[in-house]
């Protein structure tokens, strides 16, 4: 019987000897490869935090001592050690285990952490709350070195450092080796010494003694302090943290469970804010992840665990790759086109752009706010920036888009990948908020391509705009074959006419479906289901969904019912915008909006979520028929 089979709680982990801990780490890696290969998920990051997480659960008393994982996709090992290993067969599946910490799953999960750079702020607030309540509890935040490129981390660290007696332990999971490990007895000795409370008392006493010497005391103290600081900074990469007033332990080999536990115990015993710097290897212990050049299998679909290759053969062409190729074509012809990403060049399709135009590609780190304001500066300087981010991360850059780009009428194109329902990553990653946010920005123009052809077309149109921001949004996954319009009227594509024999501009019918982006396919399928019932339906794709086209308004006059269909939130979405526009011109035609309710939706596949929401062709046709009957 293996060690892992005997571990269901942190208490079980604390009972193990060193040999068993090392065996446990290897068994966990084998478990992760086997399970994530079957379901897909974040494999590389979790292979890199096995020993680190084991040590955390041996030193701290979770859940009394909160363990908060920044970018919570690195919490799989935490889930295994807190009684959830038997649920990994359903990881990221409907009704199954979340791919992120989940308060609904376990008291060991304090937050639903998934967006980067927030863990330290959670930790700061929790530590303050415990102090105010007189509770003697430690708070631990595990933050990846990538997340430290986000300014929010440093805002939090500044506040954490302001309370030297508040027990917050910040574990920097450095899996990119952006800090060089320090080797040698002097560094080890200084690390141990600096975090002993007796050392702090001695420092205070020495400081008082030196400063009390008449005339030379202050200078003597300054000289000794400078020598001490110089030695520390020469032997370990800590100045970023020590200059804030934070104690520093490390660098520590994050794959040596004994060393990791020892470092964490020293940090815990200190009793104040401490940074523990753990150097880890992403993808550790799985050859195909270690050798995966792009990102050490950061996230993967189901794979063959023996070869590391995706199951099911080659993937169909994706939206992201179409965007990537088209942007490069435009950039070849125009030297003013530059690209910006917030630490995600691969997932947003900008890696190839960066290889082709290295001087025109800017990865700003996990800093969407800065990305947008920097784009405004580039535009002011004569460039046309393209900011490519996930739709869900637009929330972070909204103020800059509103006040630094739109207010100044700067030509910045924002490309929102993973718009709409994304599925397995759950509530935090569904891109369902963007249209509600964008709809309140004066002068903004938003396109929603329905296929590869319209994505290429609309990207070109966006890059031609010189007097304000433009936005393109498209979903996750593969792009289906192109849908050809039967007619284009002033930029609006008619995909199906209620009466194919008469002019679309003047014909009358029962229903006008205004379908946004890929939902055009649902609209067309619903129209075909309604046709045998004698319901005449015209389906249009406005292409540019904001502002609402005059053509949509004119067409609406000729129908008994206008139905909008969108892969985004209903409140403030395209449906409500179309309805408001029709009312503003005094058009009294009934409207109905079909889209995503303003709810936090649990993880499941995209198709499962759409079925659950009644956004399938059958459901749409049934609801339209019911609305017509009610009239």
UniProtKB/Swiss-Prot annotation:
<dbReference type="GO" id="GO:0019288">
    <property type="term" value="P:isopentenyl diphosphate biosynthetic process, methylerythritol 4-phosphate pathway"/>
</dbReference>
<keyword id="KW-0460">Magnesium</keyword>
<dbReference type="GO" id="GO:0000287">
    <property type="term" value="F:magnesium ion binding"/>
</dbReference>
<protein>
    <recommendedName>
        <fullName>1-deoxy-D-xylulose-5-phosphate synthase</fullName>
        <ecNumber>2.2.1.7</ecNumber>
    </recommendedName>
</protein>
<feature type="binding site">
    <location>
        <position position="286"/>
    </location>
    <ligand>
        <name>thiamine diphosphate</name>
    </ligand>
</feature>
<dbReference type="InterPro" id="IPR005475">
    <property type="entry name" value="Transketolase-like_Pyr-bd"/>
</dbReference>
<dbReference type="InterPro" id="IPR020826">
    <property type="entry name" value="Transketolase_BS"/>
</dbReference>
<feature type="binding site">
    <location>
        <begin position="146"/>
        <end position="147"/>
    </location>
    <ligand>
        <name>thiamine diphosphate</name>
    </ligand>
</feature>
<feature type="binding site">
    <location>
        <position position="368"/>
    </location>
    <ligand>
        <name>thiamine diphosphate</name>
    </ligand>
</feature>
<feature type="binding site">
    <location>
        <position position="175"/>
    </location>
    <ligand>
        <name>Mg(2+)</name>
    </ligand>
</feature>
<comment type="function">
    <text>Catalyzes the acyloin condensation reaction between C atoms 2 and 3 of pyruvate and glyceraldehyde 3-phosphate to yield 1-deoxy-D-xylulose-5-phosphate (DXP).</text>
</comment>
<dbReference type="GO" id="GO:0005829">
    <property type="term" value="C:cytosol"/>
</dbReference>
<feature type="binding site">
    <location>
        <position position="145"/>
    </location>
    <ligand>
        <name>Mg(2+)</name>
    </ligand>
</feature>
<keyword id="KW-0784">Thiamine biosynthesis</keyword>
<comment type="similarity">
    <text>Belongs to the transketolase family. DXPS subfamily.</text>
</comment>
<dbReference type="Pfam" id="PF13292">
    <property type="entry name" value="DXP_synthase_N"/>
</dbReference>
<dbReference type="GO" id="GO:0030976">
    <property type="term" value="F:thiamine pyrophosphate binding"/>
</dbReference>
<keyword id="KW-0479">Metal-binding</keyword>
<dbReference type="InterPro" id="IPR033248">
    <property type="entry name" value="Transketolase_C"/>
</dbReference>
<feature type="binding site">
    <location>
        <begin position="114"/>
        <end position="116"/>
    </location>
    <ligand>
        <name>thiamine diphosphate</name>
    </ligand>
</feature>
<dbReference type="InterPro" id="IPR005477">
    <property type="entry name" value="Dxylulose-5-P_synthase"/>
</dbReference>
<keyword id="KW-0786">Thiamine pyrophosphate</keyword>
<keyword id="KW-0414">Isoprene biosynthesis</keyword>
<dbReference type="GO" id="GO:0009228">
    <property type="term" value="P:thiamine biosynthetic process"/>
</dbReference>
<dbReference type="InterPro" id="IPR009014">
    <property type="entry name" value="Transketo_C/PFOR_II"/>
</dbReference>
<dbReference type="GO" id="GO:0008661">
    <property type="term" value="F:1-deoxy-D-xylulose-5-phosphate synthase activity"/>
</dbReference>
<feature type="binding site">
    <location>
        <position position="175"/>
    </location>
    <ligand>
        <name>thiamine diphosphate</name>
    </ligand>
</feature>
<comment type="pathway">
    <text>Metabolic intermediate biosynthesis; 1-deoxy-D-xylulose 5-phosphate biosynthesis; 1-deoxy-D-xylulose 5-phosphate from D-glyceraldehyde 3-phosphate and pyruvate: step 1/1.</text>
</comment>
<dbReference type="GO" id="GO:0016114">
    <property type="term" value="P:terpenoid biosynthetic process"/>
</dbReference>
<dbReference type="Pfam" id="PF02779">
    <property type="entry name" value="Transket_pyr"/>
</dbReference>
<feature type="binding site">
    <location>
        <position position="73"/>
    </location>
    <ligand>
        <name>thiamine diphosphate</name>
    </ligand>
</feature>
<keyword id="KW-0808">Transferase</keyword>
<comment type="subunit">
    <text>Homodimer.</text>
</comment>
<dbReference type="InterPro" id="IPR029061">
    <property type="entry name" value="THDP-binding"/>
</dbReference>
<dbReference type="GO" id="GO:0052865">
    <property type="term" value="P:1-deoxy-D-xylulose 5-phosphate biosynthetic process"/>
</dbReference>
<dbReference type="Pfam" id="PF02780">
    <property type="entry name" value="Transketolase_C"/>
</dbReference>
């Amino acid at each position: 019987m293996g060690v892992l089979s005997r571990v269901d709680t942190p208490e079980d982990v604390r009972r193990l000897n060193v040999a068993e801990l090392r065996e446990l780490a290897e068994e966990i890696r084998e478990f992760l490869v086997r399970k994530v290969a079957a379901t897909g998920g974040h494999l590389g990051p979790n292979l890199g935090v096995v020993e680190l997480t084991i040590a955390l659960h041996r030193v701290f008393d979770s859940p009394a001592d909160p363990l908060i994982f920044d970018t919570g996709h690195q919490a799989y090992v935490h889930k295994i050690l807190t009684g959830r290993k038997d649920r990994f067969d359903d990881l990221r599946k409907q009704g199954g285990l979340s791919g992120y910490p989940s308060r609904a799953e376990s008291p060991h999960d304090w937050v639903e952490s998934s967006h980067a750079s927030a863990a330290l702020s959670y930790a700061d607030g929790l530590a303050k709350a415990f102090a105010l309540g007189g509770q003697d509890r430690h708070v631990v935040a595990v933050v990846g070195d990538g997340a430290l490129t986000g300014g929010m981390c440093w805002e939090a660290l500044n506040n954490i450092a302001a309370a030297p007696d508040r027990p917050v332990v910040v574990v920097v999971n450095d899996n990119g080796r952006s800090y060089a490990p320090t080797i040698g007895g002097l560094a080890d000795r200084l690390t141990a010494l600096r975090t002993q409370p007796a050392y702090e008392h001695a420092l205070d006493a020495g400081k008082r003694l030196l400063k009390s010497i008449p005339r030379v005391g202050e200078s003597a103290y300054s000289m000794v302090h400078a020598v001490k600081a110089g030695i520390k900074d020469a032997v370990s990469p800590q100045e970023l943290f020590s200059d804030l007033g934070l104690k520093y332990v490390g660098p520590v080999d994050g794959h040596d469970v004994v060393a990791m536990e020892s470092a964490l115990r020293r940090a815990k015993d200190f009793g104040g804010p401490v940074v523990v710097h753990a150097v880890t290897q992403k993808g550790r212990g799985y050859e195909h992840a270690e050798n995966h050049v792009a990102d050490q299998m950061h996230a993967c679909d189901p794979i063959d665990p023996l070869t590391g290759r995706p199951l099911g053969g080659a993937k169909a062409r994706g939206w992201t790759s179409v965007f990537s190729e088209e942007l490069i074509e435009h950039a070849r012809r125009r030297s003013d086109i530059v690209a910006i990403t917030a630490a995600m060049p691969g997932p947003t399709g900008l890696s190839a752009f960066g290889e082709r135009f290295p001087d025109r590609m800017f990865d700003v780190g996990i800093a969407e706010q800065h990305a947008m304001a920097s784009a405004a500066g580039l535009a002011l300087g004569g460039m046309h920036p393209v900011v490519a981010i996930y739709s869900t991360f637009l929330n972070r850059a909204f103020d800059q888009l509103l006040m630094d780009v739109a207010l100044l009428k700067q030509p910045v194109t924002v490309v929102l990948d993973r718009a709409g329902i994304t599925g397995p990553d759950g509530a935090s990653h569904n891109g369902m908020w963007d249209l509600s946010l964008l709809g309140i920005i004066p002068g903004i123009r938003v396109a929603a391509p329905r296929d590869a052809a319209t994505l290429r077309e609309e990207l070109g149109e966006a890059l031609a705009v010189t007097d304000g921001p433009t936005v393109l949004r498209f979903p996750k996954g593969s792009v289906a074959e192109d849908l050809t319009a039967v007619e284009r009227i002033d930029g609006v594509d008619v995909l199906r006419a209620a009466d194919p024999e008469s002019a679309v501009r003047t014909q009358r019918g029962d229903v006008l479906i205004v379908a946004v982006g890929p939902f055009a396919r649902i609209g067309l399928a619903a129209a075909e289901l309604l046709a045998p019932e004698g319901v005449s339906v015209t389906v249009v794709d406005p292409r540019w969904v904001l502002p609402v086209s005059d053509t949509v308004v004119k067409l609406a006059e000729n129908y008994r019912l206008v139905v909008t269909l969108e892969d985004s939130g209903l409140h403030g979405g395209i449906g409500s915008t179309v309805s408001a526009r029709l009312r503003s011109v005094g058009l009294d035609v009934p409207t109905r909006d079909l889209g995503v309710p303003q709810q936090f939706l649990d993880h499941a596949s995209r198709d499962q979520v759409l079925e659950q929401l009644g956004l399938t062709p059958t459901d749409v046709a049934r609801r339209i028929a019911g609305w017509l009957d009610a009239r």
